[in-house]
């Protein structure tokens, strides 16, 4: 995900101007929003152009080497167009790699280093004397469209997957108090947000680090626990979508909330593979037969459940037989939304010590076969929706039609619903659409 801050409508001649680039995942986007909210409260304005800013901030991604390359390219562009650049984010946890290429950066800070970023901005271009708190909407500065927002509930991760370096970049799990999360969510909904996308590194581990500590919310105490938070969010009147859910046993508890309509019947659960031996090398839960049984039970409880997952092909040592296990599993699981990535070595990941690298051409062929198998599954599931009426949230609207998403579709990573409507619709509207046509990823219908 890449986001660039938009300028405000305020034209203070003396106000310092910031250009901002946000790279990486939705969790990083929330970090960017937090930094921008702080700076806007101090009177800084936002510039669309690097060359029109007093300083440029680049929030980097350092998860994969390809993401690092994108981050370095963005830094280079900012240096070329402006020259006064502050770097933050996951790649900032390895400053020597950045400084080696760009030694003249103003500052390099790691992830979640909000105060350090703000301090670096202050040093580069001091804020105006008087704060402009009236410039800040109650929900803070957001880089998403007005009708949806990411809600980060924790930082860090306690898992030690061998392909991942997130714990070394962002640390162990640190959960936010439930009351704080709910107050932020309430502000967002009051400001017009129709969809809350709950994110973290490990959403279903929420509260484990605090032993499910309680905190005040309205007139009662609420536990920092996955189920409790999901239930309370479901009372706010917005769509609630759960992302990055690790398949712990207690995930079963939220499925009835989906069946009752309190939260969306959508579960983003990165499973990574299906072969027990590959999962063991990944240090991931290894009983995918049991996982199939769980998915069947979930669908019995909530027939409309849409499961999104991501998988890695070409993990070190992956054999033809292990890959065939994965293909067999996805055909049987019939997941609604699936992504696939070729394994990419990450500097510092313990998977690098496994050896037995899969050749690039084999990884590419396995990804092709995987996506081909999943496309047949997806097409069957999509065609089953033809003739049905679905609730669709509108993302974009034009004179002849609109594009939106069903409850089974998250922004940017899933498909779309293309809507024909006789009456005007606007982004954020939730309309009923009769589905007339389907392909493997998108639906087409008419507003009724």
From Swiss-Prot:
It comes from the Bacteria. InterPro entries: Elp3/MiaA/NifB-like_rSAM, Methylthiotransferase, Methylthiotransferase_CS, Methylthiotransferase_N, Methylthiotransferase_N_sf, NA-bd_OB-fold, Ribosomal_uS12_MeSTrfase_RimO, rSAM. Catalyzes the methylthiolation of an aspartic acid residue of ribosomal protein uS12. Residues 16-126 form the MTTase N-terminal domain. Its main location: cytoplasm. This is Ribosomal protein uS12 methylthiotransferase RimO. Residues 143-380 form the Radical SAM core domain.
């Amino acid at each position: 995900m890449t986001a660039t801050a938009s300028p405000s409508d305020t034209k203070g001649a003396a106000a310092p101007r910031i250009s901002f680039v946000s790279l990486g995942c939705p969790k990083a986007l929330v970090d960017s929003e937090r930094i921008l909210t702080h700076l806007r409260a101090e009177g800084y304005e936002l510039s669309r152009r690097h060359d029109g800013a007093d300083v440029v901030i680049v929030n980097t991604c350092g998860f994969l080497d390809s993401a690092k390359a994108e981050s370095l390219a963005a830094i280079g562009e900012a240096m070329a167009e402006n020259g006064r650049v502050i770097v933050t984010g996951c790649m900032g946890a390895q400053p020597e790699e950045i400084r080696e290429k760009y030694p003249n950066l103003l500052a390099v800070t790691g992830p979640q280093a909000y105060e350090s970023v703000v301090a670096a901005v202050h040093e580069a271009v001091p804020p105006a004397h008087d704060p402009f708190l009236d410039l800040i909407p109650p929900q803070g500065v957001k880089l998403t469209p007005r009708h949806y927002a990411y809600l980060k509930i924790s930082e860090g991760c306690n898992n030690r997957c061998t392909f991942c370096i997130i714990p070394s970049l962002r640390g162990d799990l640190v959960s936010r108090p439930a009351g704080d999360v709910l107050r932020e969510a309430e502000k967002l909904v009051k400001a017009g947000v129709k969809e809350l996308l709950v994110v973290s590194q490990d959403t279903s581990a929420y509260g484990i680090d605090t032993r499910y500590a309680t905190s005040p919310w309205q007139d009662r105490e609420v536990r920092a626990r996955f189920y409790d938070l999901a239930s309370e969010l479901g009372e706010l009147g917005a769509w609630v979508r759960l992302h990055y859910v690790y398949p712990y046993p207690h995930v079963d508890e939220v499925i009835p909330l989906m069946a009752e309509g309190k939260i969306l019947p959508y579960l983003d659960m990165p499973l990574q593979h299906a072969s027990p031996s590959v999962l063991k090398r990944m240090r991931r839960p290894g009983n995918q037969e049991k996982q199939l049984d769980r998915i069947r039970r979930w669908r019995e409880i909530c027939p409309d459940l849409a499961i999104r997952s991501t998988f890695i092909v070409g993990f070190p040592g992956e054999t033809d037989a292990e890959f065939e296990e994965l293909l067999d599993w996805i055909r049987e699981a019939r997941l609604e939304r699936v992504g696939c990535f070729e394994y990419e070595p990450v500097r510092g990941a313990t998977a690098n010590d496994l050896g037995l690298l899969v050749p690039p051409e084999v990884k590419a062929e396995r990804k092709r076969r995987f996506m081909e198998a999943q496309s047949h599954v997806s097409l069957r599931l999509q065609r089953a929706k033809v003739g049905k009426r679905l609730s669709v949230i509108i993302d974009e609207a034009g004179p002849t039609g609109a594009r939106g998403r069903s409850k089974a579709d998250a922004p940017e990573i899933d498909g779309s619903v293309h809507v024909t409507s006789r009456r005007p619709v606007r982004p954020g509207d939730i309309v009923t659409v009769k589905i007339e046509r389907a392909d493997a990823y998108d639906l087409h219908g008419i507003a009724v």
